[in-house]
Swiss-Prot record:
It comes from Enterobacter sp. (strain 638). The active site is at C86, H181, E183. Its EC number is 6.3.5.2. Coiled coil: none annotated. Disulfide bonds: none annotated. Catalyzes the synthesis of GMP from XMP. Homodimer. This is GMP synthase [glutamine-hydrolyzing]. It catalyses: XMP + L-glutamine + ATP + H2O = GMP + L-glutamate + AMP + diphosphate + 2 H(+). PANTHER family: GMP SYNTHASE [GLUTAMINE-HYDROLYZING], GMP SYNTHASE-RELATED.
Length: 525
């Protein structure tokens, strides 16, 4: 029997901070399982989850407003340690008898916190010392309100010049609140504080490791599907590739991978996928030529959301057809990962706007005929990559830039046509090749080319011609929730532009996208 890697677990209640998923990833990096739930969870749900500790996230609301989110009262009655971060500290203070007010000065950015009192949370943790030997911590603040009175059974652990209660603690109950963000890298000792809370105060063991996650996933797959046959849509992306390798280890020849060349893939991608998974790893793969079918279904459609839904629908139709040709296929496997699950849950409960339909989760018809197997649904992307390495997949494949599920279907703006896809494939391949040559590929987080359905005049030789426009897009980001456009060298951009215009007949102009996220998204559609 495999070890119970979920035995020690942290519950993170989400109050809406852009950093909340980062908190969860940091806890996982410490080797401890955690889950992210909406703040209005019930007492029964908390009891059932049985956490070793609870973290209250930051959030954009003000605790001084009457209808602002509050932690369920049971959080403070469950007998487990609680760690409030920013808004989480404020609602903890207010709910336990303290006071919060809007601050005259909004604290945003670096701050130095002076530790005044010994506390299990920060004992022995410091960045520097004051002249009289008190520990100082370099932290990242982001708050407007501030705690002006702490609950009577708490002590002040640390303060800044403008924030009298930067850290508060009730050591007996093991309740802690910090007015800064320990999860961001700008808080230099943040990981040590999270480690102190999760590993020492909550006494969680580091059971959440790649090797143990693989063993657990294999055991769960076998328990779920038994001797049934499973079908998987293999795209060659990180998530579906790691899913394929896990299933192959768990059930061997009972897995049939369906690789659909939908006409929306990158240059030579179909050949590369078949070579690696069919020839090298020995997986059972059915190769479906689907370009004409997908492009016919997409004909005349300009709306990005509709295009995503069409691509998802046709994928499922293809799977159903392939499954009917095989005997006893009862399960459809997918590479759904934890951020997909979080976003889909948020949209289902109305707690967040649907930015885009996830190809894996929201875009699938509800009448799908097979059961779902999702072995990665508890994992963040960085965890999926680590597991892929452990399973023997090549580094370059696992750390390739993200590629959307609908592929070039959302990188060709407006209606998708074969001509547009062919031009885009070749232009994009040149851009990526040049990034590798210039040693820039791993210095940007994501880079790709977008086809714009507008013609622009160009001069070739002695003649004028009207041809298509493409845009290059490269961004730098830590979490893909916010992003800056990458400041690529002008000579590099010039070289890429010249190559595309000279080598791809049909493109007359190349532009570079200098939009950040927000207000733009990373993908154009």
């Amino acid at each position: 029997m495999t070890e119970n890697i979920h035995k020690h677990r942290i519950l993170i209640l989400d109050f809406g901070s852009q950093y909340t998923q980062l908190v969860a990833r940091r806890v996982r990096e410490l080797g401890v399982y955690c889950e992210l739930w909406a703040w209005d969870v019930t007492e029964a749900q908390i009891r059932e989850f049985n956490p070793s500790g609870i973290i209250l996230s930051g959030g954009p609301e003000s605790t001084t407003e009457d209808n602002s989110p509050r932690a369920p009262q049971y959080v403070f009655e469950a007998g487990v340690p609680v760690f409030g971060v920013c808004y989480g500290m404020q609602t903890m203070a207010m709910q336990l008898g303290g006071h919060v007010e809007a601050s005259n000065e909004r604290e945003f950015g670096y701050a130095q916190v002076e530790v005044l009192t010994d506390s299990a949370l920060v004992r022995g943790i410091e960045d520097s010392l004051t002249a009289d030997g008190k520990p100082l911590l370099d932290v990242w603040m982001s708050h407007g309100d501030k705690v002006t009175a702490i609950p009577s059974d708490f002590v002040t652990v640390a303060s800044t010049e403008t924030c009298p209660f930067a850290i508060m603690a009730n050591e007996e109950k093991r309740f802690y609140g910090v007015q800064f963000h320990p999860e961001v890298t700008h808080t230099r000792q943040g990981m040590r504080m999270l480690d102190r809370f999760v590993r020492d105060i909550c006494q969680c063991e580091a059971l959440w490791t790649p090797a143990k996650i693989i063993d657990d996933a294999i055991a769960r797959i076998r328990q779920q599907v038994g001797d049934d046959k499973v079908i998987l849509g293999l795209s060659g992306g990180v998530d579906s590739s790691v899913t394929a390798m896990l299933l192959h280890r768990a059930i061997g020849k009972n897995l049939t991978c369906v690789f659909v060349d939908n006409g929306l893939l990158r240059l030579n991608e179909a050949e590369q996928v078949m070579d690696m998974f069919g020839d090298h790893f020995g997986l059972n793969i059915v190769h479906v030529e689907g370009e004409e079918r997908f492009l016919t279904a997409l004909a005349g459609e300009n709306d990005p959301e509709a295009k995503r839904k069409i691509i998802g629908r046709v994928f499922v139709e293809v799977f159903d057809e392939q499954a009917l040709r095989l005997e006893d296929v009862k399960w459809l496997a997918q590479g759904t990962i934890y951020p997909d699950v979080i976003e889909s849950a948020a949209s289902a409960t109305g707690k967040a706007h649907v930015i885009k339909s996830h190809h894996n989760v929201g875009g699938l018809p509800k009448e799908m005929k097979m059961g779902l197997v999702e072995p990665l649904r508890e994992l963040f992307k960085d965890e999926v990559r680590k597991i892929g390495l452990e399973l023997g997949l090549p580094y370059d494949m696992l750390y390739r830039h993200p590629f959307p599920g609908p592929g070039l279907g959302v990188r060709v703006l407006g209606e998708v046509k074969k001509e547009y896809c062919d031009l885009l494939r070749r232009a994009d391949a040149i851009f990526i090749e040049e990034l590798h040559k210039a040693d820039l590929y791993n210095k940007v987080s994501q880079a790709f080319t977008v086809f714009l359905p507008v013609r622009s005049v160009g001069v070739m030789g002695d003649g004028r011609k009207y041809d298509w426009v493409v845009s290059l897009r490269a961004v730098e980001t830590i979490d893909f929730m916010t992003a800056h456009w990458a400041h690529l060298p002008y000579d590099f951009l010039g070289r890429v532009s010249n190559r595309i215009i000279n080598e791809v007949n049909g493109i007359s102009r190349v532009v570079y996208d200098i939009s950040g996220k927000p207000p733009a998204t990373i993908e154009w559609e």
